Amino acid sequence: MASSATMLSSVATAARAAPAQASMVAPFVGLKSASAFPVTQKPATGLSTLPSNGGRVQCMKVWPIVGLKKFETLSYLPTLSVESLLKQIEYLIRNGWVPCLEFSLEGFVSRDNNKSPGYYDGRYWTMWKLPMFGCTDAAQVVKEAAECKKEYPAAFIRVIGFDNVRQVQCVSFIVEKPE
């Protein structure tokens, strides 16, 4: 008997609590009128106030479509000088990335036999020797690139900065192109 009285009192308490919680939320009365928000209108002006690059439109061509292949980030620049190349390699060494040399005789991505990427479609280049773990001298990387160029004179050669902690390629740029 006592247990049924306790159950009845808890149901009554729950019934009293429900209406109190429902009345705490204000009812939806609709959206506010547009007059409550001030609207600022820009003065109507001519096209002379629009931003313009002037006569430089002729200079916006990015690259010719015939005879000049483009690859990684720095391929739109002229061929790197030895000093510029050393600075780029020193940058990747300073960031703790492992220099690695790769080469490709074609230097072009083509998917002739399959639509999914694979080893022989040009996306993956052949590694020159092993990655240069522990390398702290940019001149050593340039020397290896020259050795690769001597072995494969008709190849594209690139340097990759590989982060061995995150297991990702962080930087990649062409150092040698075939003549």
Curated annotation (Swiss-Prot):
Keywords: Calvin cycle, Carbon dioxide fixation, Chloroplast, Photorespiration, Photosynthesis, Plastid, Transit peptide
GO CC annotations on file: chloroplast
Keyword Transit peptide: yes
SMART domains: RuBisCO_small (SM00961)
Residue stretch of the organelle transit peptide: 1-58
Cited Pfam families: RbcS, RuBisCO_small
Annotated GO biological process: photorespiration; reductive pentose-phosphate cycle
CDD domains to which the protein is assigned, alphabetical: RuBisCO_small (cd03527)
InterPro entries tied to this protein: RuBisCO_ssu, RuBisCO_ssu_dom, RuBisCO_ssu_N, RuBisCO_ssu_sf
Subcellular localization: Plastid, Chloroplast
GO molecular function, one term: ribulose-bisphosphate carboxylase activity
Note: The basic functional RuBisCO is composed of a large chain homodimer in a 'head-to-tail' conformation. In form I RuBisCO this homodimer is arranged in a barrel-like tetramer with the small subunits forming a tetrameric 'cap' on each end of the 'barrel'.
PANTHER family the UniProt entry points to: RIBULOSE BISPHOSPHATE CARBOXYLASE SMALL CHAIN 1, CHLOROPLASTIC (PTHR31262), RIBULOSE BISPHOSPHATE CARBOXYLASE SMALL SUBUNIT 1A, CHLOROPLASTIC-RELATED (PTHR31262:SF10)
Similarity section: Belongs to the RuBisCO small chain family.
Subunit structure: Heterohexadecamer of 8 large and 8 small subunits.
Main function: RuBisCO catalyzes two reactions: the carboxylation of D-ribulose 1,5-bisphosphate, the primary event in carbon dioxide fixation, as well as the oxidative fragmentation of the pentose substrate. Both reactions occur simultaneously and in competition at the same active site. Although the small subunit is not catalytic it is essential for maximal activity.
Protein name: Ribulose bisphosphate carboxylase small subunit, chloroplastic 3
Species for this entry: Fritillaria agrestis (Stinkbells)
Upper taxonomic lineage: Eukaryota, Viridiplantae, Streptophyta, Embryophyta, Tracheophyta
